Amino acid sequence: MGRRVRPFAEQDYTAYARIASIAQGERINAAEARATDARWDPTRYDRLRVVAVDEEDAPLGYGEIRQEPSRVDPRRYFIRLGVDPASRRRGIGAAIWERLATELGKRRAEVACLWAFDATACQTFITKRGFVEVTRTYAQVRAIASAPLPTPALEERVTSTGIQITTLAAVRDALGEDALEPVWELHSACRLDHAALGRATPQPFAEWLSDNVTDAAALPDAYFVALDGARYVGVSSVRRDGEDTLRIGITGVLPGYRRRGIARLLTVRVHAWAKAHGSSEIHTETTKESTAMLALNDSLGYPIVASWGGYELRLGG
């Protein structure tokens, strides 16, 4: 029968997780992949995954197109594609891409996009097929031992204007579950300015709740929010990213409250929490368009340790 591309099936999870771990540069096991897929809502977002298999039906690579829940656009599809290193340069990736391109055509997709590291097989593969870099993300890391902490002067600068800093946990304790939706709305509003591949749209409330409240990695007592009276105006969200490592999800301030030191105070409050709880590092990611955030991170001693490009292919033209 030879090599062929077929729909992804239940028996493919182990091989898929192994190949995806290599292709995506992060450890993925079959159980995690199943759990992630179980949370996908096919009634709201389209997704297709295929695998290339050998004569014995063993996966050699995979491909996926999907609508991104955090950047909903019915004509924009995000792509994932990976081939087992032992099977590369045999036309397998090309066969997978041909199948994905056909499926994109059926859906009348206008844009295909993905992230790719520099000088990788993936980058070479996609640029040969017309994908163009349109944005770039920078990974930044701060050692907690020497990280700046809140100062009386900074606290006074912010609080003297009526701004108060608290946490998601404290707000929830004080106001109950009804307090969660306004914080989610703030998170959604701040994301609108975070340029990347496509226009940001609100993360579904259930996903935000899992990420920041109920998940094992969630840290509601390190999720800092700024309030002007009863109005939520700034946020810096954090999750566990390892035994002693944290990851900032988003730091943002509503437009009318910027350039007042709020984002800086939120960030150094995170530093103080991390230091008090024995964390060694904080990781974050920022796109090149977010010049103000890059400048803030630079002033707080976050070096850029890696970067990768965001690529798009315009379809149908």
Q: PLM ranges: what are they?
A:
Residues P69, P85-L175, G309-L313:
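Acyl-donor-binding surface of acyltransferase catalytic domains
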Residues L197-A230, V235:
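A mid-sequence, solvent-exposed acidic-amphipathic segment
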Residues M1-R39, Y45, V51-D54, A58, ...:
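Short amphipathic alpha-helix that is part of the acyltransferase structural core
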Residues A20, R49, W97, Q140, ...:
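Polar/charged side chains located within well-ordered beta-strands of beta-rich proteins
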Residues E10-Y13, A20-D118, L227-D228, Y232-G249, ...:
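Conserved donor-binding loop and adjoining core beta-sheet/short helix segment
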Residues R89-T102, V253, R259-A272, A295, ...:
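Conserved acetyl-CoA-binding loop-helix of GNAT-fold acetyltransferases
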Residues V233-T251, R259-R269, W273-H283:
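Extended hydrophobic/aromatic segments used for targeting, binding, or gating
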Residues R129-L149, A222, A272, H277-G317:
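Active-site/acyl-donor-binding loops of N-acyltransferases
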